[in-house]
Design a protein with these regions (language model features):
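Catalytic-domain carbohydrate-binding cleft regions of carbohydrate-active enzymes
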Residues: 1-14, 23-28, 34-426
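Beta-strand-rich extracellular modules
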Residues: 19-21
Length: 426
């Protein structure tokens, strides 16, 4: 986002010219106005709630930041101890499309002796029309148990993406809906997602719904495969029923909740959704540490072994720079583990075109050179972030797909990956 100032006068129209050149698969432009404040207003504190009959405010004091965070966790819950492997390098992309993809890429890390702990399965491992089934599509993942066994035999870990979203034709939707635990506005308005199917999200504020949601996950992804899933990626946990929607309609799509109106409880969806998975996994396998990665967070989420990443950021230098501020602010808020889509998620068209040209000609043009340096610099930054996780859309994000082995970008990425592991004991 970019900030600029334009002098305006009361009652006088002021022309504003905005030049916008979208570069990427999906691009959005919005304009927000920050009205200037008077000197008197600058020295005042105003706290308000859009919709709440009562509100408690807490002031947590301390002699230093550690004491403040300790007080925050006394109030909201202690941070759970994550599995040690979560501190290592994670390889992800949008997306691995088969069990063969998963196994071959992990094996290549091992063959090249490049450290990695976690390989991540993003969305759409299910049949195209079966979002919410939590089932691997047999044509692309014929033997999920064998895939998981192979990952573990290579001393890897497997994380999988699960959304609180269901197409209205799948069995899991119908089971939850029969109890009255689905949000219906999206169905009523006949909203179809970018793949052309209709669905909605479940009401995670209902304890019964949470238990059923976990049971469906467990039956299809966890107990079914001998607890072979090591971690859960809980995506779209705002909940993001529909992309790029005005706030008033977002609230309509995600309510009413079991506790009350969505306006009153809007920001807390991710923590009740995390509650479902944390307590669900502990109930069936108490000897395995839980780990969740979620796109949105709420106060106290650390007690559910949950980390948060900063969402679908763009592959731009300014976006990488913004992550430095975001990560510091997040960590000071009392939640210990934070991460980002290292390398940027949404890719500018010029980088895509540059990679396509290289694939055809073997020539590195200026845009590809910049792409490779950006990936290398972002990996250097990521080495010192709590969660060291590469992820994004095409071009592919494995180091050998970013640059050849004799390229400075390749050498830099591998060097910082190994540095991460040397620093891990500290």
């Amino acid at each position: 986002s970019y900030k600029f100032e334009t002098p305006i006068k009361k009652g006088v129209k002021t022309p504003i010219r905005i030049e916008w050149q979208p570069d990427g698969d999906v691009s959005y432009c919005g304009l927000r106005v920050a009205a200037p404040r008077s000197e008197a207003e600058k020295n005042q504190l105003s706290i308000w709630s859009e919709m709440s009959p009562d509100m408690d405010y807490y002031f947590i004091a301390g002699q230093n930041l550690d004491e403040v965070i300790s007080g925050y966790r006394t109030l909201t819950g202690k941070a759970s101890l994550y599995p040690k492997w979560t501190l290592g390098f994670w390889q992800s992309r949008e997306r691995y499309k088969s069990s063969k993809d998963i196994e071959e890429n992990l094996k290549k890390f091992r063959d090249l002796k490049i450290p990695v702990d976690n390989i991540v399965q993003d969305w759409n491992y299910w049949k195209l029309d079966s979002w919410g089934s939590h089932e691997f599509e047999a044509a692309r993942y014929p033997h999920p148990q064998a895939m998981l066994d192979s990952v573990h035999a290579m001393n890897g870990r497997f994380m999988i993406s699960v959304w609180p979203k269901f197409y209205d034709t799948v069995k899991n939707y119908k089971e939850i809906d029969a109890k009255g635990w689905m949000y219906h506005q999206a169905i009523k308005d006949d909203i179809h997602d970018w793949l052309g199917f209709r669905g909605s999200f479940y009401d995670a504020y209902d304890a019964g719904a949470r238990k059923m949601f976990w049971r469906q996950m467990d039956e299809n992804l966890y107990t079914k495969y001998k607890f072979g899933t090591d971690a859960w990626w809980m995506d779209a946990s705002e909940p993001n029923v529909r992309d790029c929607t005005p706030m008033w309609y977002r609230k309509a799509l995600s309510g009413p909740t079991a506790l009350g109106t969505s306006t009153e409880y809007f920001n807390a969806y991710s923590i009740v959704n995390a509650d479902a998975i944390y307590h669900g996994q502990r109930s069936v396998n108490p000897n395995q540490r839980v780990f969740l990665l979620t796109r949105s967070g709420f106060a106290g989420e650390q007690r559910y072994s949950t980390a948060i990443w900063s969402g679908d950021i763009a592959t731009r230098w300014e976006d990488m720079r913004a992550q430095m501020t975001a990560g510091l602010n997040y960590s000071m808020a009392g939640l210990p583990f934070w991460g980002m889509d290292q390398g940027g998620f949404c890719v500018e068209n010029r980088y895509v075109a540059a990679q396509q040209e290289f694939d055809k000609t073997g020539k590195e043009n200026a845009d590809l050179k910049e792409w490779r340096e950006l990936q290398a610099r972002w990996n250097q930054f990521g080495c010192f972030v709590p969660l060291y996780r590469a992820h994004g859309q095409w071009p592919l994000r494995e180091v050998w797909n970013i640059a050849p082995a004799d390229h400075p970008a390749y050498k830099t990425i591998v060097a910082y990956d190994k540095l991460r592991y040397r620093l891990m004991p500290y």
